[in-house]
Amino acid sequence: MGQEDMMSAAEDLADQFLRVTKQYLPHMARLCLISTFLEDGIRMWFQWSEQRDYIEATWSCGYFLATCFVIINLIGQIGGCVLVLSRNLVQYACFGLFCIIALQTVAYSILWDLKFLMRNLALGGGLLLLLAESRSEGKSMFAGVPSMGESSPKQYMQLGGRVLLVLMFMTLLHFDSDFFSILQNMVGTALIILVAVGFKTKLAALTLVVWLLAINVYFNAFWTVPAYKPMHDFLKYDFFQTTSVIGGLLLVVALGPGGVSMDEKKKEW
């Protein structure tokens, strides 16, 4: 079987998967995407005093402001997740979750940690894709804004979301000299570049979903670590952040790459 035959067979398999799951895939994608916000909101409830004390000690902002921070995070994240899953006011929910990401980036000094900053940006990319999906279902927020043909804001959101998802992958690269790590990096980098430029997008994104899912379950198995150990919370954070990016990739699979992509441009050639 030649290379083209293998690629064609893989694309047929991906199309068959999409046909079988097309009714459920967007729901699964949204649930995965908001999972990190849902987990963090629930954690805010159960670790109320610890989170408040941490913010008060770090920023010396006093009891009241620290409590306000926890309340905003709790209500903003749980409320945003409920709106997204119920498909009500999704655009406002996305903007609220964007604000939560920005607030946490500053409050937890993520700006100075490149790895966590890239993951937060990738999470923002997933929200951009969710925003694009909500625009395809409901009324445009940009009604009255002059349109440039096919280059609508939705398509640029899809492009921005795809590019930001690349950042999550970059944090997973292993700079080891063994053959498996080098092969893993090369194949993964090729796939994420295909997703970013929008070439063979659905197949590349679906392959990345399977790959990230395997890595997530293997490396971030927080359920195997006792809850009292700090590593438990660290692995749980990693697990749900990666799950959210998987949700973003599933949205790419469900929606396609959008107009600003090589897949769409090929149709014009």
From Swiss-Prot:
The keyword Repressor does not apply. Keywords: Endoplasmic reticulum, Golgi apparatus, Membrane, Protein transport, Transmembrane, Transmembrane helix, Transport. One of its GO terms (biological process) is Golgi organization. The chain crosses the membrane at residues 64-84, 92-112, 179-199, 203-223, 242-262. One of its GO terms (molecular function) is cargo receptor activity. GO terms for cellular component: endoplasmic reticulum; endoplasmic reticulum membrane; endoplasmic reticulum-Golgi intermediate compartment; endoplasmic reticulum-Golgi intermediate compartment membrane; Golgi membrane. Belongs to the SURF4 family. This is Surfeit locus protein 4. It comes from Danio rerio (Zebrafish).
